[in-house]
Amino acid sequence: GVPCLCDSDGPNVRGNTLSGILWLAGCPSGWHNCKAHGPTIGWCCKQ
């Protein structure tokens, strides 16, 4: 999957670890949405 920035990673992409994975159809079982606002397409999820 494509890495994405969780809320817990920091305010922006630069210099932060992207600990989430972008899912287009929602988070799979056992994962949770880790970003409160956005991304515009899909969900940023982590285990």
UniProtKB/Swiss-Prot annotation:
One of its GO terms (cellular component) is extracellular region. Pfam families: Toxin_4 (PF00706). Disulfide bonds join C4-C44, C6-C34, C27-C45. Keywords: Cardiotoxin, Disulfide bond, Ion channel impairing toxin, Neurotoxin, Secreted, Toxin, Voltage-gated sodium channel impairing toxin. GO terms for biological process: regulation of signal transduction. Expressed in ectodermal glands. Not expressed in nematocytes. The keyword Secreted applies. Its main location: secreted. GO terms for molecular function: sodium channel regulator activity; toxin activity. Gene3D superfamilies: Anthopleurin-A. Modifies current passing through the fast sodium channel (Nav) in neuroblastoma cells, leading to delayed and incomplete inactivation. Produces a positive inotropic effect in mammalian heart muscle. Paralyzes the shore crab (C.maenas) by tetanic contractions after intramuscular injection. Belongs to the sea anemone sodium channel inhibitory toxin family. Type I subfamily. This is Delta-actitoxin-Ael1d. It comes from Anthopleura elegantissima.
